[in-house]
Design a protein with these regions (language model features):
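Intrinsically disordered, low-complexity boundary segments flanking structured domains
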Residues: 2, 15-18, 78-80, 263-267, ...
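Short, charged, low-hydrophobicity "junction" segments
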Residues: 2, 30-32, 65, 463-469
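Hydrophobic transmembrane signal anchors and adjacent membrane-proximal interface regions, especially
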Residues: 8, 53, 149-151
Length: 496
């Protein structure tokens, strides 16, 4: 409603009255979208009449005919106050939502009240947190406070019904049907099952559950079981991994990871800000070039392939040391040292072209590499999901993301067969188009600077699963294209 370019084309405005809002004389300005089914709002703007024409307060409601997934009604209220230096800041925010799971069934109601106070703009000698560029970051101990602390520090005391909410939730969890729904939702979102009835006391979680059963051409039916320790066992040391077995190849695969977190964690190792040292040992089956960003390769829905069967595969045995450091200004540094043995499997062959023109079949090759990646996302909000910032459930994607990485192969180090240098750079941004939706744009480029065998060249990420995966080519087969340099563009338009 305040857009300087599209507002008057998208909304109709009506002056309703002149009112007093918390001591400020304001004009009550009503607005409605020209099209009642469009993604816009109806509501009121309260504009001060002191010559500054500042927004003192606004009310936003979704139109009656809007199609907004499971949301039936949404109302947002914000009120602002003027500071002594004439800066306007947010004072109160109320959000009301009516939503449903099944159309026509009993609706659910949610209300959130947020109050802001004690703004400080002239902090002297800012410490290492407030002196950085990042926005709001929640430290693990921020929510681990006693009831007494909140009684003395809340700007607005809780009402009696609000204070009883925790007791109500505890009673609801005793209802079997409700508890089953909550547990199922937690498993679907996190992918893990706690080993205690109270998740906050679990020392080990089983998962991810969507990787328990899968299948591929080489292994046939594949079974996998794994999990991870939590901060309830130790807030600095974390272990995770899995065991997997294929019915056809009858080989046991495994992954074991031990992580030391310099920062004390609330529940799992991936909580922001990350400052972790990890050691990884792994032996497993991979498809060349396939690297899904938002899920595991063993996800049962990703493992279900369509089209031409994927028969070219690899057994990879890997030992890796990794250090990852995340600063609150959006900069992340990742460095690693890796030794990897790559064995051809299925219909994949490694043939060496000798000087006399003959081909020699190689069962496997070994490479040792050092690598580093810089990731910079200025203004990015912290996300504490187990899968990290690339998680599908991380909806905070407005900040631009820039990445620069380089990998260097070291011949004759720990049996390595090749020298190589591989550089990649990328830029990603969500572009908002006002009422016309948004575009997720990603541009990447990479180059291998040395002469290397094809498994060490650049392979576009193919996707032959039944699901559409971001940043993957859905019409491409594994190893269909291999190159030593590339530029790729990914643009996804979400229309409204």
């Amino acid at each position: 409603p305040l857009s300087s370019t599209l507002a008057v084309s998208y909304y109709k405005y009506y002056i309703m009255d002149t009112v007093d809002v918390a001591g400020d004389k304001c004009v009550d300005l009503a607005f409605v979208p020209v099209n009642s089914q469009s993604y816009g709002f109806t509501g009121r703007l309260y504009i001060t009449l002191d010559g500054n024409y500042a927004v003192k307060k606004f009310l936003l409601n979704t139109p009656a005919n809007i199609n907004l997934n499971w949301v039936d009604k949404l109302r947002i209220e914000q009120e602002f106050k003027r500071m002594p230096d004439s800066t306007w800041v947010l004072a109160n925010e109320n959000t009301y939502v009516n939503f449903y799971i099944v159309k026509g069934a009993q609706q659910l109601y949610a209300h959130q009240l947020r109050n802001f106070d004690k703004y400080q703009f002239d902090v002297q000698n800012a410490d290492s947190i407030f002196g950085l560029l990042g926005p709001i970051h929640e430290l693990p101990e921020a929510t681990a406070q006693t009831d007494t602390f909140w009684i003395h520090n809340r700007h607005v005391p809780l009402k009696e019904k609000e204070s009883a909410l925790d007791d109500l939730l505890a009673q609801l969890r005793k209802v079997p049907a409700f508890n089953v729904i909550i547990k199922t939702a937690e498993i679907l979102i996190t992918g893990y099952i706690p080993t205690t009835a109270d998740k906050d006391k679990s020392k080990f979680d089983f998962g991810p559950m969507n990787t328990t059963f899968s299948a591929n051409h080489l292994e046939g039916f594949r079974m996998r079981v794994g999990g991870m320790t939590t901060a309830n066992l130790n807030p600095h040391w974390f272990g995770s991994g899995y065991l997997a077995y294929g019915v056809n190849d009858r080989k046991l695969k495994y992954n074991a990871k031990l992580t030391y977190s310099v920062n004390k964690k609330k529940y799992h190792e991936g909580e922001s800000p990350v400052n972790n040292i990890s050691a990884i040992q792994e032996y497993d089956v991979y498809t060349p070039g396939q690297d899904f960003l938002f899920t595991s390769k063993d996800n049962m829905f990703v493992a279900w392939k369509v089209g031409e069967p994927v028969t070219m595969m690899q057994y990879i045995r890997k030992t890796m040391l990794q250090y990852q450091k995340e600063w609150l200004n959006g900069l992340t540094l990742t460095t690693w040292a890796r030794n990897e043995n790559n064995e051809a499997a299925g219909t994949l062959r490694y043939d060496r072209y000798d000087a006399d023109g003959t081909l020699t079949n190689l069962k496997s090759f070994t490479n040792t590499e050092l690598g580093t990646q810089l990731r910079f996302a200025p203004g990015e909000r912290a996300y504490n999901g187990r899968e990290g910032k690339n998680s599908l459930f991380n909806l905070s994607k407005d900040a631009p993301v820039f990445k620069l990485s380089h990998q260097m192969g070291l011949k004759n180090v720990l049996g390595s067969d090749f020298n190589y240098n591989h550089t990649e750079i990328s830029a990603e941004k969500r572009i908002w188009l006002s009422s016309f939706g948004h575009i997720d744009a990603l541009v990447t480029a990479g180059k291998v600077w040395d002469k290397v065998p094809f498994p060490l060249l650049i392979m576009p990420n193919p996707n032959q699963s039944i699901t559409i995966q971001p940043q993957a080519f859905n019409m491409m087969r594994a190893l269909e294209f291999v190159s030593d340099q590339y530029v790729s563009f990914y643009f996804t338009y979400y229309m409204k």
